[in-house]
């Protein structure tokens, strides 16, 4: 929510895939006072928490939390989104979390990167942006799926624990279609090199 670059004037509809408790959707609602934000998650308990959080916020009238599988989701009015954000599942099949609800929400078999890009393309307007966070080990796969889906990289931030260490996560922002400029790449250390 805080990292994704969104144009307040051009962004009227935003979709948060895998909204969980709704934190990213709430951050976007705060940043984009003219936008409607839809959070979607497959886990009913997460959606209930997101609905409670949205209702307690000053942005409640612009937030909608939906319990659905993005693979089958259709916006009520059929209108495409201007921006999509996602913190997608990141566990591989070999490393399932013990809790079943967390497994459903975080398991890559439930929503592969290929499927994520197919549905982002289906739900996003041409020229719209798609921002997501992925494990660094998945970068090549994600960039490949993005290219196959007609997305172009706009921005990449490698998240490292300390300067000089290999990245743990990658923050990526794509545009559906051709990018107006060369992608901006940077690094975000979580701690100073000497700390």
What does each model-found stretch correspond to?
Residues 111-167, 171:
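Conserved Class I SAM-dependent methyltransferase catalytic core
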Residues 51-76:
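S-adenosyl-L-methionine
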Residues 164-195:
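SAM/dcSAM-binding transferase cores
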Residues 11-18:
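Conserved class I S-adenosyl-L-methionine
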Residues 36-41:
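Conserved SAM-binding motif I beta-strand of class I
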Residues 88-115, 119:
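Mobile active-site "lid"/loop adjacent to the S-adenosyl-L-methionine
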